[in-house]
Amino acid sequence: MRNYSLNPTEENAYKLLRENPIQRNEYVFQFVRLLTHMEDNCYSVALNGDWGSGKTFFVKQVKLILDAHNPQFHMKDETRREIQTLYKADEKPNSYATVYYDAWTYDNHDDPILSLVYAASQSGQKADLSDSPSHVLEAAAAVFDAFTGKNLTS
């Protein structure tokens, strides 16, 4: 029996965003607009759907749009322009540093904080650390302290 499922890779999410075969882009764009109009508070968002209903693709497509509008994100200029053209809104989204964290991938790790930090480090954000590498280390140590209760900063 042939499998017709599509793996939720970044390339496939981009292709579905470009081609819009199931007419879902409007929902993706509405969600990006919702994020853009949220106040500066903390929010939790739950996406509920059956297995295989497209939650992962939805999140990855939202991430692509946000990344395309973030000048600090590594992305080919042509891809960035095409995604920005697809997302036609009165306002461009805020510039967010996005991190895709797949909890199932890291399910067997003992310390979820380390896997989260790893996922963030692989996120594709540009960073100029040449001016203040010690500040970066201090910030990383403070995050470690906060999550572990250990005291690296003293």
What are these regions (language model features)?
Residues 1-45, 65-94:
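A short, basic N-terminal segment
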Residues 8, 49-51, 103-105:
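Short, flexible loop/turn elements at secondary-structure junctions
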Residues 16-28, 53-59, 108-116:
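Phosphate/oxyanion-binding active-site loops and adjacent basic polyanion-contact surfaces
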Residues 41-61:
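Walker A/P-loop nucleotide-binding motif
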Residues 59, 64-154:
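P-loop NTPase nucleotide-binding core
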